[in-house]
Amino acid sequence: MEQNKTEPYKIGVMMDMPGFPGASDMFGAAAQFALDEAFEIGLLDRPAVTIQVDHLGQPYGDGYHSRNAYRQLVEEDQVLAIAGPLTTDNSLAILEMVESMKVPAITICGTQDYVGKYAFNLSNGNLADEPHYIAAWLKSRGHKRIAVVRDYPSRIGMEFHRFFEYATQQFDLEIIGVGNVYPAPTEESMTEVLGRLKQTDPDALVYLGFGEACRELNNGLRNNDWWPERIMTSAFVQATYHEFFAELIDGWYGIDQFNERNTRFADMLKRYHQKTGRSLTPNSATSSFYDIGHCIAIALSRMEIATPEAVASALETIRLLPAVTGGPGTYITFGPHDHRGFKGLDYLNIRVSKNGGTELDSFEFSAG
C-alpha cells in the first residue's frame, strides 16, 4: 500500500513596502532560507514554503491593502503563520484581524501597541527604545539643546516623539524646538520647517519618523546652509539597503541593527552564497527576516498539532535564541505575555552614512 504524501508547511510573507531594492527583495529570501536550513538539518519533518503577497501599504496606500493581504494568506492560502507586515501603521491595521482569525503574524514594526495573543514582534527598531538610545548618544557627544523635526500627523512620528520627551528627561536634555512635516514632505515644506528650527540655534538636530522624509532632509538643510550634527531613528536603515538611499542622508547618524561584529550574521550570509550562488544584502532587513524564519521553523518543530494556534503556543517556548540581527549579545526570547523577541543592550546600534555607505559608530549604550 502506498504511503500518503506529506504536504509542505505553508508560511505567509506580507510585503507592504515593495520597490525598495536591498530590502523588499531580501525579506522573503531570508525567511525561506531559514526554513530551508531547518529542514536540511532535520529540525523539520517536511519542507516549509513561503507564499508572498506584495501590496502597497501605508503610507503609500491605506490599511485595507494590508488587511486584504492578511485575509488572502489566511483564507485562500491557509498558512500556519505569517512573517510581516513591516511597518507600524500596517501592523496596527491588521491587529484586530490577527486576534480574531488566530493566525500569528510576526512583524518587524516598532510600536508598543502591536500586542496580542497572536501578535509577535522582532522589531527592526523600536519606537520606545530608539529615543532613549538617541538621547544617550546626544549626551555622550556633549549636546544639551535639541531641535526635533518629526512626521506629523503620523502614528510613528507621534509615538517616537512621546518617548523622546521621556528620554530627554532621563538624560537631562532640552527640546528647544519642534518642526512638523508630513510623512512625505515636499522640499519646500522641509526647507521652511528646518529654517525655523535653525533660528533656535540648537546643539543638534533629531529626525523622528518613518523615513520617507529622508528624501528631503538634506535638501532642506542645504537650502538653509545649515549642517548641525544630526541623528535619526531607524528610518536610517534604508541607507544600508542601497547606495541611493545612503547618499540621500549623507552625514546623518541613525539607529540601525546591522552590526559587523555579529559573526552569526556573516556566517549566515556565507552559507546562503555557498548554497545558492547568490548574495543577500548585509543589512537588518535580511537579518530580521532570517530571524523570523528561524523562529517560525522552531515553532513548527515544537507544535503539538499543525494549526496556527499551536504555532503561536510553540513560539512562546523560544528562549535565549542567538540572533543574527543586532550585536553579538542580541538574543530572542518569547513567553506567554512577552511577544517582543529581541533582547540585549546591543540589539540596537548607531551608524553613520558616508559616501554612499554606512559605518558602525563606536557608541555603546549606557542607561546613566
Label the model's feature ranges.
Residues 1-368:
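Extracytosolic ligand-binding ectodomains
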